[in-house]
From Swiss-Prot:
One of the components of the core complex of photosystem II (PSII). PSII is a light-driven water:plastoquinone oxidoreductase that uses light energy to abstract electrons from H(2)O, generating O(2) and a proton gradient subsequently used for ATP formation. It consists of a core antenna complex that captures photons, and an electron transfer chain that converts photonic excitation into a charge separation. The lineage of its organism: Eukaryota, Viridiplantae, Chlorophyta, core chlorophytes, Chlorophyceae. Keywords: Chloroplast, Membrane, Photosynthesis, Photosystem II, Plastid, Reaction center, Thylakoid, Transmembrane, Transmembrane helix. This is Photosystem II reaction center protein J. InterPro entries: PSII_PsbJ, PSII_PsbJ_sf. It comes from Tetradesmus obliquus. It is a single-pass membrane protein. The chain crosses the membrane at residues 10-30. The gene is psbJ. GO terms for cellular component: chloroplast thylakoid membrane; photosystem II reaction center. It is found in: Plastid, Chloroplast thylakoid membrane. PSII is composed of 1 copy each of membrane proteins PsbA, PsbB, PsbC, PsbD, PsbE, PsbF, PsbH, PsbI, PsbJ, PsbK, PsbL, PsbM, PsbT, PsbX, PsbY, PsbZ, Psb30/Ycf12, at least 3 peripheral proteins of the oxygen-evolving complex and a large number of cofactors. It forms dimeric complexes. Belongs to the PsbJ family. It comes from the Eukaryota.
């Protein structure tokens, strides 16, 4: 296996996994916050 798919010393798949997980976490927190906000306002 060659290191053509690496940026510096960090593999691209690791960056993609981290960014994807962070994006999913932010979306989950946003939807959860809006859901709780709607539930408390009703």
């Amino acid at each position: 296996m060659s290191n053509t798919g690496t940026t510096g010393r960090i593999p691209l798949w690791l960056i993609g996994t981290f960014v994807g997980t962070a994006a999913l976490g932010i979306l989950a927190i946003f939807f959860y916050g809006s859901y709780v906000g709607l539930g408390s306002s009703l």
